[in-house]
Swiss-Prot record:
InterPro entries in the cross-refs: OPRT, Orotate_PRibTrfase_bac, PRibTrfase_dom, PRTase-like
Quaternary assembly: Homodimer.
Protein name: Orotate phosphoribosyltransferase
Magnesium listed as a keyword: yes
Species of provenance: Campylobacter jejuni subsp. doylei (strain ATCC BAA-1458 / RM4099 / 269.97)
């Protein structure tokens, strides 16, 4: 499966000057919503991700995603795994569980995103689940931007990764783009202004 080509074919591999949800800047942005708007393609991708997770024989009861970006990927992965699905959402800058969703003590969760950059939002969701008595056993995403180590791809973890080292991350592929702090962003230095297509604060 050529994940990069799928994103390009769907107009989801964008070039410009972007402010990522992590606060970093990048010349490239992956707009997974353009991929996941096709139900058949979403099902195909998440069926493949479910097979990868199943091959590691990890036991879990539910999948949880951070809103908004992770919801479609998480729901489709839950369907493919025949598991329950819930999502966390940001209220007053705090990741919370609402809408009557419950976490029973000792139940095991995989946290699913569409794209993992440093893993900040996924980690916030994991901490929310754990604060309510759940146990997070792993993370999953359609793609990793090259910072967090990926179990099934055997890709190494970089220093700015926020996901815990002791839990696996499963993805369909890696996209390795340069990202920059605002203070040393070459696009900013050329006078360009970053736009924010992502999830936080929108």
């Amino acid at each position: 499966m050529n994940l990069e080509q799928i994103y390009k074919d769907r107009g989801a591999y964008l070039e410009g000057h972007f402010l990522l949800s992590s606060g970093k800047h990048s010349q490239f942005y992956l707009q997974s919503a353009k991929v996941l708007e096709d139900p058949k393609l979403a099902a195909k991708l998440c069926d493949e991700l479910a097979k990868i997770i199943a091959s590691y024989k990890i036991e879990f009861d539910s999948i949880c995603s951070p809103a908004l970006g992770g919801i479609l990927a998480g729901y489709e992965l839950a369907r493919a795994c025949n598991k329950r699905f819930i999502f966390t959402e940001r209220v007053n800058k705090e990741m919370t569980l609402r809408r009557g969703f419950e976490v029973k003590k000792g139940k095991k969760f995989i946290i699913c995103e569409d794209i993992i950059t440093t893993g900040g939002s996924a980690l916030e969701s994991a901490k929310t689940i754990e604060s309510l008595g759940g146990i997070v056993v792993g993370f999953a995403a359609l793609a990793n931007r090259g910072f967090c180590g990926v179990e099934n791809l055997k890709s190494p973890r970089k220093d700015n990764a926020k996901l815990p080292e002791n839990l696996p991350l499963f993805t369909l592929g890696n996209f390795e783009f340069e990202i920059y702090d605002e203070t040393n962003c070459p696009l900013c230095k050329k006078g360009s202004k970053a736009i924010k297509p992502g999830s936080r604060g929108n």
